[in-house]
């Protein structure tokens, strides 16, 4: 019987190559052109994207990226590379590649990197703990397009999500406990997930249920009363309704009601990025404090912490 050689493909969203309007425009064009992300009629969407959204948003978003840019690139790229390298060290006999749905390194370059290592089985781990058609579904689509162009394709194991994975929940819980020990236990732990249009959920995307699963399991692991944990959704885009309650509006309401101390975690992000470091850690902090809140801390993503890497190793082990 022929022995199988397995490789691991870590997949994430992607990032601009530089904090410049030109680089951000290239990235946003690719991202916002994906039907998994925006499924509006192309006849309506293309003119709006090209003539309004990209020209107006690219310079503003570039300034935000510049405010969090690190020596090795964007935070998402830096932490994703650290994850790749740490997992490769943890699994020295297994090639590990990193691919992004948008920007570089692309998913295609990651597949080619693994095939050059003569693997005949690839375990694909999209680093989105909660499935959504707009994230995990986009990875699946691109992977199918890539493999459709290959004469010989490897076996594929595709991890749909890990919203209730025991190691993942424990890693989150330990991160929360460390934050409580450092800053004191807050009046409320707010778990903020990236939003999706409500229409997507109505049409069958089980993302909100997967977010609720993570929230329930994490609250249970922390032995926190239900009223001490709240789930919200951030980063809505466009005019149609998105999943509610909205994070920014909730923080404003809580500050106005006299809630003094809040800590915020984003369990749906495997690595810190512009969204967590700027929108959640900075913008939403100002919203809460401006509404009367007294103390606000953001709990970082798991990034390349040893516990997170061990979780990844255990997760892919079942498919190797």
From Swiss-Prot:
InterPro entries: Ferrochelatase (IPR001015), Ferrochelatase_AS (IPR019772), Ferrochelatase_C (IPR033644), Ferrochelatase_N (IPR033659)
PROSITE patterns hit by this protein: FERROCHELATASE
UniProt-listed CDD domains: Ferrochelatase_C, Ferrochelatase_N
Reaction catalyzed: heme b + 2 H(+) = protoporphyrin IX + Fe(2+)
GO molecular function (one): ferrochelatase activity
Subcellular location: Cytoplasm
Keyword Repressor on entry: no
GO cellular component annotations of the record: cytoplasm
Listed Pfam families: Ferrochelatase
EC code(s) of this entry: 4.98.1.1
Superkingdom of origin: Bacteria
Keyword terms of this UniProt record: Cytoplasm, Heme biosynthesis, Iron, Lyase, Metal-binding, Porphyrin biosynthesis
UniProt-listed GO biological process terms: heme biosynthetic process
Pathway assigned in UniProt: Porphyrin-containing compound metabolism; protoheme biosynthesis; protoheme from protoporphyrin-IX: step 1/1
UniProt KW Protein transport keyword: no
Matching SUPFAM superfamilies: Chelatase
Root EC class: lyase
Binding annotation for Fe cation: 194, 275
Known partners and oligomeric status: Monomer.
Family in the record: Belongs to the ferrochelatase family.
Its biological purpose: Catalyzes the ferrous insertion into protoporphyrin IX.
Entry-linked PANTHER family: FERROCHELATASE, FERROCHELATASE, MITOCHONDRIAL
Name under which the protein is recorded: Ferrochelatase
Taxonomic lineage of the native organism: Bacteria, Pseudomonadati, Pseudomonadota, Gammaproteobacteria, Enterobacterales
